[in-house]
Structure formats: structure tokens, C-alpha cells
């Protein structure tokens, strides 16, 4: 029996009225209609870029390079028995994956909305590109208009946008950070024409940009426990590192209610709160005991790192978000059902548990909404066992009781809309159970010191 | 016997030699070597033999190696590397490391810099395990054999990946000199990011160097020399020293003649390309 692919990412504008979700290689947009409480489909975009084409281009390019190199070195062309030279020319062949080759997933990552809420940004794995969409709220056919698709040499792993919404900063899997003006034309030969503005010798996991005291900064986090703060646009001047993590960093955020604070999490079993201006760690919140009851067989370490008892479990924070106007953070550990909400004391900067919320399935993503009327979290779930229910849960703050709770009715309405959008059997996001994209890959960033010499 | 892995034969001379040296290292690596140690030992230590420390010439700087590095520069225990400069009454070091030799190889430069800069602590960083062991054994032997006048107390080596973890060891503006001697050329285009001088890494080197600190580079590969010069000249925080400065600088002389690679190039009558750069002060922040 086929199912609608679980949602990998969900974001909304500040009011929570416009919602964008990623299913497989599709982005879909909905608008919440206040009058009838329903979600209307506003637009859809599918990544149809074929990786085969890219491989073919790469193969042709490599062949041309080898031919040129042979020419230069004066290597003789092969000869037939009669002594005639023959020009060997092959069509570029697209390599066909052999049996047991890992499947290719055209993931869409790093979904985010610009500060002025007129653009949606994302990254496509297929051609390692950054996608910029204009959100045309008045276009009833499709509100998502792709205005830029810029491929990068290595896969973008995290992106952010500057406060003026003019520049996207891209951190890639190879450790390089690029800055791209949205309005500039697409660069074809990105390898030759684009220089990174800064870099780590490590996979990058997060990037932020912020302004403090009239100075602009870029923060980057990596697999080697580092959080680096550089000036911007003078990104060649490193301001400082924030040292303290002992495992990889997977998620960093700066709350808008206090831009001197940076919060980070990852493979360590604690949430770190920093005064990044001073470069000091102010607090660490250990979540081990909270999370342990929710750790399951998905967290067993890979065989080659497993202990003799076969019970070594490894887990890490997948994502950490902060509410823009209130001193609350929320995070979840990968492959758990538990959402943890923390409150920060704004005078002592100590974190304490505000609330735990158990979701019906494992959480795959979290984002926030917040305006003067409402605030809370958009949560997507690994609902593959649910029979096409519970794709998303909206969690909102009840200001009278100061507690967060799941908005069941609204969440159900959204789920109905998803089913309506994708219920047809031939829908691109209909998959078999074993075709679901990998949803849990943060823990694979954990280092085990595999290489000795 | 598997020739690529001589450790499989537990009685090979190399394994016996390495085991013996490892025990020696364990005992002496972090010990304050002075006349009393010498009296106990009563004999001179032989310098290590390079042929027992062979290993692959390259190491992938992107790999997940088993490395020891401090969480931050504040956590670094320098007393273990430079016990002679540790004041046990205050619990503090009397000096900080100010010179770093990145990719120090077999340690030739360290050993020649030691007497030339007696007031500085000099650290070599090397990513290859056996090569690091060799340098450690060499320093242990030299310290022991010169215990009377406390020579070679100001140099040491750590096994590490400077491309990833340099800022874990050094504070901002801690270093006055950094050496990059005969680095791995990484000829292939797609491996250029693995080179030790890239525009992104230079920003990190600039962070640990103080104003007017010097980056020294030397290589026998002209392409790599041009690459390093290009990137250093393009970087806003570095400015090249002229030929006259190079000719009058004692480090350039030592670097040209001291390193094992330098000697090898000398024997083969190859070229040596030198370039030195001054760390400029940060410009005004815009």
C-alpha cells in the first residue's frame, strides 16, 4: 500500500497564515482561511532536475579535459594495425548504478522565508543549488515563482539571509561559505568564478547573520565542535570562536529578543547558551534525563561502533529554534516524539524546562510562528505508519495559562488539505514504505576517530 | 607477511624498535629532563633512526582521525610539552608558544630554531603518527643528551590537524611566526582545498598571528609557490616581504638549509622557492 511521503520540513510566515511544506522533492504552499478555518492550496513546485543530466555534463567535461591533457602531453593517438591513426570518440555514457548502489534522493533542504516575507528560500540536492522563490500571494494558480536557481560546487548544507533580504549566505558540506546577491545573474561556472568568503575544514551545519552595535557578523557551526564568528562583509577578519562543544554542532540560533545571545546544540547532551559578544558560555542545559525515556532502537550505534553488549545508543539534537518575541526555545532529539521547550531567565541567563510535549510520532522538523496575536511552533512528523494522518501538528501558546498545547482542530484541517492535494494514486509524493527518504541523518555526523594514521 | 603492514609480524625489527621507543616515550615524554635524570640514566640516548618510522607520505586532512586536541586554548596543558617552563609554585607557564611550524615533518627546522630563538617556545604540528613519534623521540634524545645546559627545552611537537584545530591551541595574536615548509603540493585541481594555504584558512592564521607576525613559506614546487604567493597577496591581512628582507632574515637562512626536505632538494640540486609575509593590522571594521 502506498502512502503520502512524510513532511521533511514545514515553515510559515510570522502570522502562521502562509505555510510551506516539503514532501520528497516537492514544495507545497497553503494559506489559512480565517473565515472557514481551512487551508487552501496556493502553489506547488517540484524539483524536476534530473541528476543524470548533470552526470552527463560532468562526464563530457572530464572527457574534454583528458583529451586536452593528452594533446598537451603529446600522447599519440591510437593506431590501427595498418598504421592509420584513429580518432577515438565516445559519447559520454551516463553511469548506471549497479545492484546495491545507494538510492539517490533529490532532497529539498533549508527551507526558509525572507525577513520581508516576500521570498521563500530552499536548497535542492539534485544540482546542489540554492532556490529563490518569489511568493506571489495574489497569484491563485501558483504562488511559488522560481526567480533564481544557482548551483554551487558542493552541496549547500545551511543558508541564511541578511537583514536587508538582499544577500543569501550559503554554508556547504565541504566547509566553504559563499555570499550570493539575490539580484545578481546566475553564474554558470561557479567553480571558477565564485570564491568563498570564509571557510572551515569541516562540514558546515549552520550559518547565521546578525548585526550588533552597527557591525555585521556571520556565525558558522561545523562538525568539528566549532562555532566561528566572522565579520561581514570583511569576512577575512575572524572575530572569535565559541569553544565548549565536545561533539559536533548541528543547530545554532540567535533569538531576536536578545541578539547578544547565541544558543547551540548538537551531539552533546546539553543546550549551550552563549554571550557571543563576550565569547562566554553562560549556561548549559543537560537534557539527558528528559530524553532517555524516549530513546529507542533507532538510536543504536552503527555496527562498527557498537559495543559487545549491543546496547550503545547515540543521539543528538536535530534542530533548535527560538521564539522571536519571548524567551523560549524549543528543540527535539532526532528520532524521538518529545518536544522540549525551555525558558531563559533574562536576568541570570539560566535555562529551565518550561514544558515537555509528546507528539504522536517522531518529529522531523520544527519552525516557529509569532506575531502580536499568536505564537508557537510548526512541527512535522514521521507519520509513515499513520495511514496518511498527522503530517503536521501546530503548537500554540495559551497566554492565560502560559502553556503550549497542540491545536488539534487546526492541525487536522491542514492534514486534510495535504491528503486532498496528494491523494491521487499517481501523485509524485506517493511512495511505498521502503521508499521514504532518510529522515534521520544528524547522528551520522558523530565522529568516532575512524582513521588512525 | 603483509609488506604493507609490518605490524602483523610481531617480531619484526621495526615492531620491536617501535615498541621499545613507545615505552621510552611514555616514560620521558612529559618529564622535566635535567641533570638528575641524566645521572639516573647514566648514558646517552641514541637519536632515533628514521627508517623505523616509515609511513605513507600523505594524510587526508578531511578525515575523521583519532586526535587529541584541547576544547579551547584555555584548556591546553602546555606544561606537558614544555615542562622546563612550568612554574609549579604558581601553576602557570613562564612562557607561551610564539612560533609554530605547521607540518613540521621530521623536525629539522624545530631543532635548528631551538638555539636561534632561546627566548621563544616553538611548537611543531604534524598529522602523521609515526613522523610525530620520530620527532618526539628525537627531542627526548636531544633533551637528555644536552641536559646539562638545558638545551632543546623550548621545542616540542604534537600530532594534530592544524587545518581543523589550530584555533583550539592558540589564542588570538599569540604567535609571532608561522612556518609552512615543503607542504604537500596536492597537484590535482579538485584537491586544492586540501592545500595548507587557502584564502579561507589564511583568515584563521591571521587570527592566531599578532600584528607584524610573519608567515614563512618554502617549497620546491613552483606551481605551489605561485599558488601560495597568489593567495597570500590577495588576502587583505598579509603583505609580502621583499627579497632584501628575505636575504637578511635568519629564519629564511635556517629554513632554506635546515629542513630534511630542504636538504633533500639540495642533494637533488632542485630549486627552492621562498616567500614571507607580514600580518597587517586589521583594517577599521565597516
UniProtKB/Swiss-Prot annotation, chain A:
WD repeats lie at residues 103-143, 244-286. Keywords: Nucleus, Repeat, tRNA processing, WD repeat. SUPFAM superfamilies: WD40 repeat-like. Its main location: nucleus. It is found in: Nucleus. GO terms for biological process: tRNA (guanine-N7)-methylation. Pathway: tRNA modification; N(7)-methylguanine-tRNA biosynthesis. Residues 69-99 are annotated as: Disordered. PROSITE patterns: WD_REPEATS_2, WD_REPEATS_REGION. InterPro entries: Trm82, WD40/YVTN_repeat-like_dom_sf, WD40_repeat_dom_sf, WD40_rpt. One of its GO terms (cellular component) is cytosol. HAMAP family: TRM82 (MF_03056). Required for the formation of N(7)-methylguanine at position 46 (m7G46) in tRNA. In the complex, it is required to stabilize and induce conformational changes of the catalytic subunit. Belongs to the WD repeat TRM82 family. Forms a heterodimer with the catalytic subunit TRM8. PANTHER family: TRNA (GUANINE-N(7)-)-METHYLTRANSFERASE NON-CATALYTIC SUBUNIT WDR4 (PTHR16288:SF0), WD40 REPEAT PROTEIN 4 (PTHR16288). This is tRNA (guanine-N(7)-)-methyltransferase non-catalytic subunit TRM82.
Curated annotation (Swiss-Prot), chain B:
GO terms for molecular function: tRNA (guanine(46)-N7)-methyltransferase activity; tRNA binding. It is an enzyme of class 2 (transferase). One of its GO terms (cellular component) is tRNA (m7G46) methyltransferase complex. Its EC number is 2.1.1.33. InterPro entries: SAM-dependent_MTases_sf, Trm8_euk, tRNA_(Gua-N-7)_MeTrfase_Trmb. Pathway: tRNA modification; N(7)-methylguanine-tRNA biosynthesis. It is found in: Nucleus. S-adenosyl-L-methionine binds at residues 103, 126-127, 161-162, 181, 259-261. Its main location: nucleus. The active site is at 184. Pfam families: Methyltransf_4. It catalyses: guanosine(46) in tRNA + S-adenosyl-L-methionine = N(7)-methylguanosine(46) in tRNA + S-adenosyl-L-homocysteine. The keyword Hydrolase does not apply. Keywords: Methyltransferase, Nucleus, RNA-binding, S-adenosyl-L-methionine, Transferase, tRNA processing, tRNA-binding. SUPFAM superfamilies: S-adenosyl-L-methionine-dependent methyltransferases. NCBIfam families: tRNA (guanosine(46)-N7)-methyltransferase TrmB. Belongs to the class I-like SAM-binding methyltransferase superfamily. TrmB family. Forms a complex with TRM82. Catalyzes the formation of N(7)-methylguanine at position 46 (m7G46) in tRNA. This is tRNA (guanine-N(7)-)-methyltransferase.
